[in-house]
Amino acid sequence: KETSAQKFERQHMDSTGSSSSSPTYCNQMMKRREMTQGYCKPVNTFVHEPLADVQAVCSQENVTCKNGNSNCYKSRSALHITDCRLKGNSKYPNCDYQTSQLQKQVIVACEGSPFVPVHFDASV
């Protein structure tokens, strides 16, 4: 079974991320990373930075998560990310996403030993 840390990597890490400038990036990646199985995941963020840099966020600024938990951490610097948002008229199985390239700070929830990201909470 996939661990929480592995799921985070599958859903949110794309360190090569060279093709994120393509308008079809989200449609391809959401399918490839298995987030359009059974339903279309409405919103998802991919981070185009080395995994080690994202894992390092777990030792940066401690902030409260959206759900009230206290194990979220905010990156010191802005990271290259791509936001994928399901278009309003899109229906499963034809999941159609809007692709937006951004540079923002990210907030991730971390847990475990080693202490690693397990949930993408927000970008700010």
Curated annotation (Swiss-Prot):
GO CC terms, sorted: extracellular region
Active-site residue numbers: H12 (proton acceptor), H119 (proton donor)
InterPro entries: RNaseA (IPR001427), RNaseA-like_dom_sf (IPR036816), RNaseA_AS (IPR023411), RNaseA_domain (IPR023412)
Residues binding substrate, per UniProt: K7, R10, K41, P42, V43, N44, T45, K66, R85
GO biological process, one term: defense response to Gram-positive bacterium
The enzyme's E.C. designation: 4.6.1.18
Alphabetical UniProt keywords: Disulfide bond, Endonuclease, Hydrolase, Lyase, Nuclease, Secreted
Region feature (Disordered): 1-25
Superkingdom: Eukaryota
Disulfide bridges in this chain: C26-C84, C40-C95, C58-C110, C65-C72
EC category name: lyase
Subcellular locations according to the entry: Secreted
Role, per record: Endonuclease that catalyzes the cleavage of RNA on the 3' side of pyrimidine nucleotides. Acts on single-stranded and double-stranded RNA.
Subunit-level organization: Monomer. Interacts with and forms tight 1:1 complexes with RNH1. Dimerization of two such complexes may occur. Interaction with RNH1 inhibits this protein.
Record's protein name: Ribonuclease pancreatic
Native organism: Ondatra zibethicus (Muskrat)
UniProt gene name: RNASE1
